[in-house]
Amino acid sequence: MKIYQFPTFRVETQLFHSPGAGYDGGLTSGGAQFITPEPGGFSMLEIAPALIDTEWDAPLASWIMSKISGQVFRVRLAPSPQIAFSRQRGMVAVPWSNGQAWSNQENWDGDFTAVYAAAALKGAITMSFDLTGVGPIVLPGHVVGHGSETYLVDEISYVGNVGTAIVTPPLRRNIAVGDNCYLRPWFTGRINNGADIRSAYDNMGHVKPGNIVLQEAVV
């Protein structure tokens, strides 16, 4: 299966969330609940791009708009409040301290990579990771990653710098001791709202695509 690398561009908003295993419907007077094929639910990533003024130089917006027929993307999450980064560590190494533009999404403290401190099996909802070097900065509401999957931290407790977290959705693959734990993770998914993205396209070179909604692809 071909997996495309999602391009890096400025974003106004980004939100990773896991809607859950079921949702209510109105098929009967008492309502109905539909269960997704993924036990424990699935995850989604919503991105609101900022204005893109480089379309004539690199037509990435139109390229994304053409990939709405089930193509799979690997997306690096942009810096956001869901990324545990330098706000917890002091404003020391962030790009704006040396005049660089922070919007390039590079060189953030959130790029720190921890290691997993315990093995965990696919389908589990608990993981342990060692944050030696940055300290216990990951809190409920932050995201962490393993491989090309992202997980939302629901609960976490610490013994020193080792955190044990309950996460959603359940683990998509086995974790081994020493595997990388990404504080700025990757997400693998498919775009499911192509018409919304295309509606704002024009040929003037100043493009602000509509919100991009990616639904998790388990590959």
Predicted regions: what is each one?
Residues 1-219:
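Extracellular/virion structural assembly segments
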